[in-house]
Curated annotation (Swiss-Prot):
GO biological process, one term: carbohydrate metabolic process
Uppermost EC category: hydrolase
Family of the protein in this entry: Belongs to the LamB/PxpA family.
PANTHER family in the record: 5-OXOPROLINASE SUBUNIT A, UNCHARACTERIZED PROTEIN YBGL-RELATED
Protein's gene: pxpA
Subunit structure: Forms a complex composed of PxpA, PxpB and PxpC.
InterPro entries membership: Glyco_hydro/deAcase_b/a-brl (IPR011330), LamB/YcsF/PxpA-like (IPR005501)
Reactions catalysed according to its record: 5-oxo-L-proline + ATP + 2 H2O = L-glutamate + ADP + phosphate + H(+)
Keywords, comma-separated and alphabetical: ATP-binding, Hydrolase, Nucleotide-binding
GO MF annotations in UniProt: 5-oxoprolinase (ATP-hydrolyzing) activity; ATP binding
Classification via Pfam families: LamB_YcsF
Disulphide-bonded residues: none
Name assigned to this protein: 5-oxoprolinase subunit A
The protein's Enzyme Commission number: 3.5.2.9
């Protein structure tokens, strides 16, 4: 069995530092690099891609809404076509830096509110898919396991990586529990490790109300802006490899 560990990276901005990219990068196999709209800037993008190349980590674009103040976690009203073009713009920006760093983009993973809305809203999912296909139909689209977007992307012929968040609580619907809900983010590395092992052994994840959800996991996400992200990523990787699971980039699966 094989799986991927991904992390949102390059989410600092100017003098503001978010995450532990230098410590986390050696523990993961795919990096989702912010493209300057919800976080990141040209200097951060360049440094993050160079760091990923140094550690042999595959990279992808992590586009979000134009919302630095809200860190891309607020829903924004958009007109038809805007989400598609927001994503195209950001993929193009990151691709320029990727080319300069001598690396190729592997995937696209929308950020925050855009990601969550695409998981359940047909128009948003359609525009995400259109953007990826317009730029490069060979790119992998990372989206929530079991979501509307995952099914629509597969139907459209895209390569899909179904994503599971071991450090996030799930609703019984399969959606992520809102961050405003108590217990929505799990910080205990041991609890996260137990969830990962249950997932790889049974294909099930326990929801916030104790029910089991069947989830396909092509890639596991660790949130780089959480305290102790480095310890968490290392713990997950060790648990997987000890259980005989090969941890490789999603494009190598």
């Amino acid at each position: 069995m094989r799986t991927d560990i991904n992390c949102d990276m390059g989410e600092s901005f100017g003098s503001y530092r978010i995450g532990e990219d230098e410590k986390v990068m050696p523990c993961i196999t795919s990096a989702n690099v912010a493209c300057g709209w919800h976080a990141g800037d040209p200097m951060i993008m360049a440094r993050t891609l160079e760091l990923a190349a140094r550690h042999g980590v595959a990279v992808g674009a992590h586009p979000g809404y134009p919302d630095l103040l809200g860190y891309g976690r607020r829903n924004l009203e958009t007109f038809p076509g805007e989400v598609r073009n927001y994503i195209l713009y950001q993929i193009g920006a990151l691709a320029a830096f990727a080319g300069a760093a001598g690396v190729k983009l592997q995937h696209v993973k929308p950020h925050g509110a855009m990601y969550n809305l695409a998981a359940r809203d047909e128009r948003t999912a359609k525009e995400v898919i259109e953007a990826v296909k317009a730029y490069d139909p060979g790119l992998i689209l990372v989206t929530l396991a079991g979501s509307l977007c995952a099914q629509m992307a597969a139907d459209a012929g895209l390569r899909v990586a179904a994503e599971v968040f071991p450090d996030r609580a799930y609703l019984t619907t399969g959606q992520l529990a809102p961050r405003s809900m108590p217990g929505a983010v799990i910080h205990d590395p041991e609890q996260v490790k137990e969830r990962v092992l249950k997932l790889v052994r049974t294909g099930m994840m326990t929801s916030i109300d104790g029910r089991d959800l069947a989830l396909r996991a092509d890639t596991l996400c660790v949130h780089g802006d959480n305290p102790g992200a480095c310890l968490l990523a290392a713990s997950i990787r060790e648990a997987l490899e000890t259980s005989g699971v090969r941890v490789v980039a999603m494009g190598a699966q």
